[in-house]
Amino acid sequence: MSKYSQGRFVPKNPAKLIGKQEVVFRSSWELTVMNFLDNHPSVIQWASESIRIPYTNPLTGRPSQYVPDFMVLYQDKNGNRRAEVVEVKPSKEALVENAKSKRDKASLILNTAKWAAAMSWCKKNGMTFRILTESDIYITKPKKKR
């Protein structure tokens, strides 16, 4: 049994979805983002795992392919169309200060290489790259000091 929430996402607005008709979420965070993209009126189109970006794996030195979680086309508050590539990751795999274990640190090294390649790819294609962590996806109240 998987430790994380996984399953198939069925969009309520399938006309917004680009590409493959079967969309799989690999975490509850991805599911939350999918629901947002599917339902938000500013999102024009979105795709899940639709692009491959070449990069060199810093742990093995071998060429590899990075498949970001989402590609999104939306209209900003000024009416301009924007395109973004979006990755959903836990903060322990995205932020140096949160990577405590050896595994988290290795994931961070690998992710940093993937994200550098993604930023370069996005710049060449007139897009932006965004990493979403749990603090971006969920609004939580600050803990009270005792």
Q: Language-model features: where?
A:
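Electrostatic, structured charged patches in enzyme active sites and in nucleic-acid/phosphate-binding
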Residues: 1-146
